[in-house]
A protein has these predicted regions:
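Proline-centered flexible-loop/turn and helix-kink motifs
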Residues: 96, 165-166, 204
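N-terminal secretory targeting modules
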Residues: 1-73, 77-88, 92, 252-255
Length: 255
């Protein structure tokens, strides 16, 4: 598995570098970054992408009994459901029974998710549902304004719908970040989330939920018990997250 992963990563990296250098400047600048697919040139990122391809190919094998039925798409916050992350016990409890594939990659912005989706094999049969939570890195580590980040989320949702037209999609509002309600990141995330209902309303099979208040106290304060670094959920917060969305996902999946 590791041999496959490294070979895939090196080959793909070389190809992308040459293609990127050959692309006309006008093409590179024609879209805002939040809605234009963009690769990341980190070896671990390619290795993880290769692992996801291998998981899909295994699921697509007619002899394999486990079929992928749920996609969990996002950044490090979703990535932390994986092995050794604070959400691993929660994943096993709630999402392993739903045959979920973790497509969360640490540090990703909306444009990176778009690239990843474009470079995945088709899942057969199509997944029943997907959950999407992305955008915090657009605001806090990118140069996007809240509306631009929201448009990136809209573009990912359109992409998922185009890939699997019958799949139900649950888009989550970006989780709160930083302890205080008046922190600039908090305000930007609140603004970002305010755009999503209108941006998503015309995309088929899409539902929107904002569960951010579940992590806050009555005064809007984000405790380190919920998010120790004021960004990434603790195991307790992962449990709250899973409890909030699993009933809706099960409904979408007909389970």
């Amino acid at each position: 598995m590791k041999i496959f992963s490294n070979r895939f990563s090196v080959t793909l990296l070389i190809s992308l570098i040459f293609n990127f250098e050959a692309a006309p400047a006008a093409e590179l600048d024609k879209e805002h970054p939040s809605t234009a697919p963009q690769v990341r040139l980190a070896s671990w990122w390619f290795d993880r992408h290769a692992e996801k391809i291998a998981e899909i190919e295994k699921s697509n094998n007619p002899k394999d009994e486990r079929k992928i039925e749920l996609l969990m798409v996002g950044d490090s916050i979703t990535n932390n459901f994986d092995k050794k992350g604070p959400g691993e016990p929660v994943w096993k409890k709630y999402f392993t029974p739903l045959n979920a594939l973790n497509l969360g990659f640490g540090g990703d912005r909306t444009n990176h998710v778009l690239w990843r989706l474009e470079h995945l094999p088709k899942i057969k049969p199509a997944p029943l549902a997907a959950s999407l939570m992305i955008g915090t890195n657009n605001i806090c580590w990118g140069s996007d304004k809240p509306k631009q980040a929201a448009e990136g989320i809209q573009e990912i949702t359109r992409k998922l719908n185009a890939m699997y037209p019958k799949m139900k999609i649950l888009v989550l509002g970006v989780f709160p970040r930083r302890e205080q309600l008046d922190h600039p990141h908090r305000k930007q995330i609140i603004e970002l989330n305010s755009y999503l209902p209108d941006l998503l309303k015309d995309i088929p099979n899409v539902s929107f939920m904002d569960i951010g208040s579940e992590f806050l106290d009555e005064k809007g304060f984000l405790s380190r018990e919920m998010m120790p670094d004021t960004t990434h959920p603790s195991e307790k917060a992962h449990e709250i997250w899973a409890q909030a969305i699993t009933p809706k996902l099960r409904e979408m999946m007909g389970k």
